[in-house]
């Protein structure tokens, strides 16, 4: 889970390791151990890999669940199967996505607290969860950050097919080199 942070038209580069590694913001101090060695990182809750792991654990814990009807082997579970389970009304999957939104909301509240009002755009496979992800994200952000900052901030989702990363890079070049935008 990464972020492209743009401040006054300039991409924040940070240290040689980089900037925008929001996947390693702690959102659950008592949470699972992350690959980075810390506990409760956003990455352990909100990455597509962690969503698959969490839903897989639910399927393994209940072999008669609707998820098991969609995939016979929980180890073969993928995001597409999770979307199908969600469309079928699976409440366990709905809860996983709600928790994912809440974790993103905690991270967003931290970003808003540090950077001030900002635009936060969700992109990638999790963007397909739409309002089911955004609503708990916004609610959590609003509960955890200064109201004046959250009112001035925007949270949204890009279409899954969007080339937002390429478009953002092109916009930075146009702005920085040509003064356009």
Please identify what each model-predicted range represents:
Residues 1, 19-22, 152:
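A structure-centric signal for secondary-structure junctions around beta-strands
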Residues 11, 29-33, 38-181:
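ATP-binding/phosphotransfer module of carbohydrate and carboxylate kinases, centering on a glycine-rich
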Residues 2-6:
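Short beta-strand scaffold segments in enzyme catalytic cores
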């Amino acid at each position: 889970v990464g972020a492209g942070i743009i401040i006054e038209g300039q991409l924040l580069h940070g240290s040689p390791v980089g900037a925008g590694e929001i996947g390693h913001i702690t959102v659950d101090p008592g949470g699972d151990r992350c690959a980075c060695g810390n506990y409760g990182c956003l990455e352990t809750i909100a990455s597509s890999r962690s969503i698959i792991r969490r839903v897989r654990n639910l399927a393994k814990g209940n072999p008669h669940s609707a998820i098991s009807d969609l995939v016979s082997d929980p180890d073969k579970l993928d995001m597409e199967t999770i979307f199908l389970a969600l469309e079928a009304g699976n409440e366990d999957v709905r809860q996983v996505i709600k928790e994912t939104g809440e974790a993103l909301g905690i991270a967003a509240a931290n970003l808003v607290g540090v950077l001030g009002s900002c635009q936060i755009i969700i992109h990638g496979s999790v963007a397909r969860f739409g309002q089911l992800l955004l609503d708990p994200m916004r609610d959590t952000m609003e509960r955890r950050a200064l109201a004046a900052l959250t009112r001035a901030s925007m949270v949204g989702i890009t279409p899954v097919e969007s080339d937002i990363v390429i478009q953002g890079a092109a916009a930075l070049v146009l702005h920085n080199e040509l003064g356009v935008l």
